[in-house]
Every structure is written in C-alpha cells, then in structure tokens.
C-alpha cells in the first residue's frame, strides 16, 4: 500500500529498494514517513474499533492493535536510543545491556521475543493517546541521534532495520484490516495483459545479497552462486478466469490434485467455514451467460466483483499448488522467481 506523503527525496525514493543504501538525510525523512503511515492506519482502526477498546479476536495471524502500535515504537527504541552498540551495526551483541526506556514497563509489554503471542490479549496496555506520545518521543530521540551518526553501513544499520521493521508492520495493519473486514482505501490491481510462456535458458545466478549491498537481513546473507537449469515460466500471475476453470472442474473436490497435507488443510477449512474456494470469496464460478469468470470477493469489508483478468488473491500455497497440478504446471523455485 503506497504511502500518501512524500514520494521522492533527493536521488532515492523512499519507496525504492535503494533504501537499503539510504544515507542519513533520506533515512530521517523515511522514518518520519513510515511513522506517519503507521498513524494514518491507526486512525482507520480508531474509527472502527475505538468503541470496543480495539478488541480483536485472538487468532494466530493477528496481534491486538494497541500491542502492534506499542511494539513498533519499542523496537526502534530498543535497537537505537537504548542500544549503546548501535554504531557496530550487525556486529553488535544483540544481548548487550540496554539503557532504560523512557516508558516504564515497555519491555514486559512489547518485547516479542519474551511475550508469547496469545498472552498479548491479556496485557494491561497503556491507552492509545499514551502510546502515541511514546511513539512521538522515541522517534524524536532516534532522529536526534541520527543527525550525529556517520554515513556508513554499520552506523546506519539499525536505523534501516527500524525503518523496514515499521514498514513490515504497516503490511500487518493492512492484512489485519482485511481479516477483520475493516474499511481501508487500498488500490485494486488492474487486469493483466495476456500471459505467454517465457523460456529462460540455463544459467548461474547469484542468490542472496553481498555485504556491499547496504542493509541486508540475516536470511539474505551470504550470497551464493547456484546453477539454474532451463525452465519455462508464465509472464503474468494466474488470473481469475484461469482459476475459475479449476474450481468449475471440481478442483476443490478432487483429492488427486492436492498434496496430502494440503488436502487435510482443505478438509479442516471446509469443516470450519465450508471452504470451496479462496479466502474471502463469496461466489465463484462460470457465469451462465457468456462463459466469463464470476467471482465475488470481500475486500476490506466490501463485496466486490473481480474481473476475469485480475490476478488471483488470497490463495494458500496448497491451493496454488493444486491449481498447478490441474494445469500441468508447477510453482517456481526461489531462484527461478
């Protein structure tokens, strides 16, 4: 979901992968932009959930909204203003003693390594206004430190980490809204152009990122050369008109199309909610007149009719794999993707 504030700063866009190498000045603006984005999303939750004290169901894919909010501020403070080894970047000792927080109790509330998921629903958290104040104060402290920070990868590592962490939780706010049926203004993907098979010749490919790439997560290192055999891949994602044919051909009733574990998953979903199609789909099939795809899917609390040329959304790996078996295809490996 695109942010609504500044889009281009200096030579690097704050929505660009080049943010991995962003310098101090760009990072400062990007951190403010990410926080504005968090608060904008929070505002939508306040409209929908403030009267019920932001209560949401305790399910594995969600966090309580107030916990989500406080955790973002806690994470940045923990790794930046409270971290005396922040200048060492990824060479810092993650277990090193931290300075005290400006807010008592935050480690017991918001440290995701120590607070089990389900227990987050039973915490007595501060109110939304107090948490907003905590986020403001910690951001200001972190930005003051950033002004005095050298422009090198080690010194900027945790500032970039805090930025990407907050962006990741921005995604969590969005998918939580979809799960709960809360209204958000998120652009729909348009119809795809025609898909054709693309033959990719055999090659060797560098998978992962080198240290010189700027910021990298630990699971992106080290880079390694891998042999990639020749393969064929479609140039566009699977669209609804293709997936509807799979459903119409009994794809959700034919065990032979499913991985054994996927079939067990499907039966559990069917017992739970009568699942016979992708998540959030209310109707799916071939239209009686014209033979076009007919898909009605809930998007952020609204029932919308999907166009046949739009990409399929909200399918699990099991469903995607079953479609591939039906279509005589397979899912791409990471290096192929």
Q: What is each PLM-predicted segment?
A:
Residues 51-52:
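Amphipathic, low-complexity, repeat-rich surface-exposed segments
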Residues 8-15:
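Acidic, carboxylate-rich catalytic segments that either coordinate divalent cations
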Residues 2, 19-34, 39-45, 56-335:
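Extended beta-strand/loop cores of jelly-roll/beta-sandwich
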């Amino acid at each position: 979901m695109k942010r609504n504030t500044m889009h281009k700063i200096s030579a690097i866009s704050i929505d660009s992968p080049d943010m991995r190498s962003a310098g101090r000045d760009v990072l400062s603006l990007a951190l403010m932009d990410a926080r504005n984005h968090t608060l904008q999303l929070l505002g939508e939750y306040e409209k929908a959930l403030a009267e019920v004290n932001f209560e949401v169901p305790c399910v594995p894919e969600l966090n309580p909204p107030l916990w989500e909010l406080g955790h973002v501020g806690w994470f940045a403070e923990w790794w930046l203003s409270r971290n005396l080894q922040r200048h060492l970047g990824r060479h810092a000792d993650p277990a090193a003693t931290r300075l005290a927080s400006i807010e008592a109790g935050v480690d017991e509330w918001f440290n995701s390594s120590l607070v089990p998921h389900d227990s987050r629903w039973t915490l007595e958290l501060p109110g939304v206004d107090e948490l907003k104040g905590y986020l403001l104060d910690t951001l200001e402290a972190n930005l003051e430190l950033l002004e005095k920070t050298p422009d090198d990868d080690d010194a900027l590592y945790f500032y970039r980490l805090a930025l990407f962490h907050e962006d990741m939780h921005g995604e969590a706010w969005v998918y939580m809204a979809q799960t709960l049926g809360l209204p958000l203004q998120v652009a729909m993907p348009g119809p795809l152009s025609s898909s054709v098979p693309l033959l990719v010749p055999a090659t060797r490919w560098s998978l992962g990122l080198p240290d010189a790439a700027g910021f990298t997560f630990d699971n992106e290192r080290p880079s390694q050369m891998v042999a990639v055999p020749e393969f064929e891949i479609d140039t566009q994602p699977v669209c609804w008109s293709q997936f509807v044919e799979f459903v119409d051909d009994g794809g959700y009733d034919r065990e032979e199309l499913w991985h054994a574990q996927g079939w067990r998953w499907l039966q559990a979903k069917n017992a739970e909610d009568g699942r016979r199609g992708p998540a959030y789909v209310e109707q799916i099939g071939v239209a009686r007149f014209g033979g076009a795809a007919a898909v009605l899917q809930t998007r952020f609390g609204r029932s919308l009719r999907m166009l046949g040329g739009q990409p399929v959304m909200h399918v699990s790996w099991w469903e995607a794999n079953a479609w591939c078996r039906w279509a005589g295809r397979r899912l791409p490996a990471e290096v192929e993707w």
